[in-house]
């Protein structure tokens, strides 16, 4: 099986097509699949670093990393999505997101925004990543 390709860009570096595809996937998963009705376009994307994994032309996971004081008090990771489950892409995107939070924003503490049902996923993964 092919290994997914990591993409990492600031909002300003995103092409129009990339931005559209990221927002389309977020809407498809959060609004349509999970029935989470909230304002996805919250004004924080412009200051964030966007990460996504692709296999071919398909996004299999994505996340955004927000600097201190943008979305939460601390550096934060949110809008985490996997479109293909059971392949470890969620863990991969979280590892890359944590590395990005530390490298680009100097994070020593990271807030993770998650829906209630997903908190166990993050708690289990974070302990294996951050020691």
Question: What label would you give each PLM region?
Answer:
Residues 84-97:
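Conserved acetyl-CoA pyrophosphate-binding loop and the N-cap/start of the following alpha-helix
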Residues 52, 58-67, 74-81:
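Conserved beta-strand in the GNAT
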Residues 109, 116-131:
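Conserved active-site alpha-helix within GNAT-family acetyltransferase domains
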Residues 67-77, 85, 104-108:
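A conserved beta-turn-beta hairpin within the catalytic core of GNAT-like acetyltransferases
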Residues 81-85, 113-115:
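Residue-level recognition of the GNAT/N-acetyltransferase active site
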Residues 1-47, 55-58:
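Short amphipathic alpha-helix that is part of the acyltransferase structural core
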Residues 101-115:
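Conserved GNAT acetyl-CoA-binding A-motif
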């Amino acid at each position: 099986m092919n290994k997914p390709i990591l993409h990492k860009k600031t909002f300003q570096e995103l092409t129009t097509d990339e931005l559209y595809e990221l927002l389309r996937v977020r809407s498809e998963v959060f609004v349509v699949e999970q029935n989470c009705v909230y304002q996805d376009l919250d004004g924080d994307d412009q200051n964030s670093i966007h990460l996504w994994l692709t296999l071919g032309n398909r996004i299999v996971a994505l996340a955004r990393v927000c600097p201190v004081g943008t979305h939460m008090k601390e550096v934060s990771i949110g809008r985490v999505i996997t479109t293909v489950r059971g392949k470890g892409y969620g863990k991969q995107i979280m590892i890359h997101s944590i590395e990005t939070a530390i490298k680009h924003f100097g994070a020593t503490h990271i807030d993770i925004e998650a829906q209630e049902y997903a908190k166990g996923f993050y708690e289990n993964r974070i302990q294996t990543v951050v020691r």
